[in-house]
Amino acid sequence: NMRREGYEFAVSKAEVLYHTDERGKKLEPIELAYVDVPEEFSGSVIQKLSQRKGELLGMTPINGGYTRLQFSIPSRGLIGYRGEFMTDTKGNGIINTSFEGYEEYKGDISYRKTGSLIAYEDGEAVTYGLFNAQDRGTLFIGPGEKVYAGMIIGENPRTEDIEVNVCKTKHLTNTRSSSADEALRLVPPKILSLEQALDYIDTDELLEVTPTHLRIRKKILDSTLRYRANKK
């Protein structure tokens, strides 16, 4: 019924529920994570989980060239990690978790090491604009797609966000060059599934879910207001 009515959802990154102890200290949920990975991938997994405030409790070799890792880790440290985990272990890793209890807040976590490519203006993405934008990172859209200012249209391999104008058309002149006649080649866009998009979004971003489209956007669409908010 909701699909038929054309409803749209704006979904934020998952958040955990914090508690406060009798001394006013902030507490957060902690989980025990049991991770079975091929030995050659154990170093990468340990590094990633440690960056997410995980504490390695044990490391045991098991059958088939696998290593079993045991971590104590904040629940929020596992948010958005499973997709990354499957990539790092080439689909050969297994991770199981169980709730351990509440402990003192472990500190801030940087969920994503990359930035976003953000649409500069409303309009329709064109080949020329996308061709110039693809040098900045990985695109999530192709030509002909409608975009709006503040919409995320790709991923920047560096940490900062960049505004790009994917609606920009080539300035036409009366003089034609040989290079102008060459077709612009676009790298196929990376199409995110619902699960991948939920893993990707950062705390200042939203995922718009409609019956026909998935769109990622900044919570604050206006670039000036977004800049001011980030300065606070």
PLM regions: where:
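Accessory interaction regions appended to the cores of large information-processing enzymes
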Residues: 1-232
